[in-house]
A protein has these predicted regions:
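Signature aromatic-anchored transmembrane alpha helix within multi-pass, membrane-resident enzymes
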Residues: 8-12, 211, 215, 282-289, ...
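Membrane-interface alpha helices of multi-pass inner-membrane proteins
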Residues: 16, 20, 117-119, 125-131, ...
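Short acidic/glycine- and proline-prone juxtamembrane loop motifs at membrane-interface regions
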Residues: 27-29, 126-139, 303-306
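Short hydrophobic/aromatic helix or loop-helix immediately within or flanking a transmembrane segment
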Residues: 33-41, 53-77, 92, 138, ...
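Transmembrane-helix motifs of polytopic, lipid-linked glycan transferases
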Residues: 84-109
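Perimembrane helix-loop-helix junctions
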Residues: 149-172, 181-214, 315, 327
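Hydrophobic, aromatic-rich transmembrane alpha-helices
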Residues: 193, 258-285, 292-295
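Membrane-embedded, lumen/periplasm-facing catalytic core of multi-pass transferases
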Residues: 330-455, 460-461, 481, 492-496
Length: 503
């Protein structure tokens, strides 16, 4: 796969512009499972969530951003390198995915469908919003579509090109290391290839490359954790055997069909369903259906779990668009496509620049305000980025945790409440039990889990209650708009910073 010089720089410039202007928050894993471990690894401070203490996560994905931090530190780029370095790298990954899906569609479906695929990809609101974020799913998407460019699909005639096949296997194995569930699509494609080719060589090569990549990853993880541990095994045990992923939410079985796909595809969703129906006999379409079906059997579901398939979904949408009679007339074609694409613009811009921006803005405020000595977040857990954005080794910071239950009976699991739950069940009781008196003697502090910090951060939904509880001990010193509406009542309103008054 050779880069088209005019196209790739344009795509990179486009994704860079999005990455550097995105100011909002989507889901915690963008920070807490990627940038925070990387920041802690390089700078030696921060917070590692329970997954890292239990060895559920491979350091492979955070290591990518740790390299960015190391280079930034070497070049003395300061805060700018810490904040913008990962964004630049992720924009490169996103642009590579854009270019790769274009070349893949061109290779297998022709110029018209490849152009329509590229249109869907660059105008997708969800792609605009998520592809430049540092989720492992985002890099998984890039690796998947890059690997497919080298994979021998059912339209490939003759013998398998073993060099291309080897490249595909390496990329696929790395994707599976980053996200173990990526093995679903590759297992389907692999079995289909074996059935079609009936070659022992392709099986042994897959086994050899898979073993090498897994062994290297195991070595890196052992060096990181300083103990013999296998995150892939721990991950599967937690999510499948113990089924504790359901602690983070349970969705109905049709979630991916009726909720996730419309979120991913927005205006392109009817064309996707039509296109995948047209292509239902192809291995790629069947692989996508298989992956969505298996994911639907797992109780905990999230839209970003199938996000890596979005480039492929755009191909199926393009296949449908290509069949529309209205597109046979040039003037109507471009008018229709332009209107269709423009429908995504308001959603993409609002999600990237406005909705949930306060929780990111407040970390910039903390980073750039030297007078802040300590800060506490009375919010649902992981509501903001952490030291990857605050980058302050000189302050004491805490937040309410939400670690899942481990080693409890089924009856205990049903009634388990994490720390954040306990706080929101009865905020005043929690504050009395875990904090000293607001204006109390400092000798009392040791008896309590928390001390009152120099600054408190809350959502507007809690503002009235907190003001009533702390009285004149704290005053509002900064406010950041966060959202117009929010599905979680605990997160509604502005992000408000309270400053402690001197005694």
């Amino acid at each position: 796969m050779r880069f088209n010089v005019p196209l790739f720089p344009l795509l990179l410039q486009y994704r860079l512009q999005i990455a550097l202007t995105t100011k909002t928050y989507f889901q915690p894993d963008e920070f807490w499972q990627a940038l925070e471990p990387a920041h802690e690894l390089v700078y030696g401070y921060g917070y590692l969530t329970w997954e890292w203490k239990e060895g559920l996560r491979s350091i492979a994905h955070p290591m990518v951003f740790a390299i960015v931090y190391w280079v930034s530190d070497l070049l003395r780029l300061g805060d700018a390198g810490v904040i913008y370095g990962p964004k630049v790298l992720q924009a490169l990954f996103a642009a590579t995915a854009d270019y790769s899906v274009y070349k893949f569609a061109q290779k297998y479906y022709g110029d018209e469908i490849s152009q329509l695929t590229l249109m869907c990809t660059v105008t997708s609101a969800f792609n605009y919003f998520v592809s430049i974020r540092t989720f492992s799913n985002s890099l998984e998407m890039t690796l998947l579509i890059c690997a497919l460019n080298f994979w021998p699909l059912d339209k490939t005639a003759g013998q398998v090109n073993m060099l291309n096949y080897s490249i595909a296997l390496v990329l696929a194995a790395i994707a599976c290391v980053l996200r173990p569930t990526n093995i679903l699509i590759w297992s389907y494609l692999g079995v289909a290839l074996i059935v079609r080719q009936r070659s022992f060589k392709i099986v042994t090569l897959a086994g050899a490359i898979g073993t090498i990549i897994l062994s290297l990853n195991a070595l890196v993880d052992i060096l990181y954790y300083q103990r013999l541990t296998f995150p892939l095994y721990n991950f599967l045990k937690f999510n499948i055997v113990e089924s504790l992923s359901s602690f983070y939410g349970v969705n109905r079985q049709v979630y991916y069909i009726v909720e996730a796909l419309p979120q991913l595809l927005t205006v392109y969703v009817p064309f996707f369903f039509h296109g995948i129906y047209i292509s239902r006999s192809s291995t790629l379409a069947q692989a996508c259906i298989f992956v969505v079906f298996v994911y639907s059997l797992i109780s905990h579901k999230e839209v970003r779990f199938i996000f890596p398939l979005l480039p492929i979904f755009h191909i199926f949408a393009a296949i449908s668009l290509c069949r529309l009679r209205i597109l046979s007339r040039p003037k109507l074609k471009w008018t229709f496509l332009a209107l269709l694409s423009l429908l995504n613009v308001p959603l993409a811009l609002y999600a990237s620049t406005t909705h949930q921006r306060g929780v990111v803005d407040v970390t910039s405020y903390i980073r750039t305000t030297p007078s802040i000595e300590s800060v506490g977040f009375l919010m649902p857990c992981h509501s903001t980025p952490w030291m990857s954005h605050m980058h302050r080794p000189d302050i004491t910071a805490w937040f309410l945790t939400c670690e899942p239950p481990r080693g409890l009976s089924h009856s205990e699991l049903a009634t388990y409440r994490d720390e954040a739950d306990q706080f929101y069940d009865d905020p005043e009781l929690f504050l009395r039990m875990h904090f000293p008196a607001v204006t109390g003697n400092q000798t009392e502090v040791a008896r309590f889990r928390y001390d009152w910090p120099s600054h408190l951060v809350v959502f507007g939904a809690l503002e009235e209650l907190l003001t009533s509880y702390v009285g004149d001990a704290y005053v509002e010193c900064k406010r950041f708009f966060n959202s117009h509406v929010h599905e979680d009542p605990r997160r509604r309103g502005d992000v408000v910073v309270f400053c402690k008054q001197n005694d």
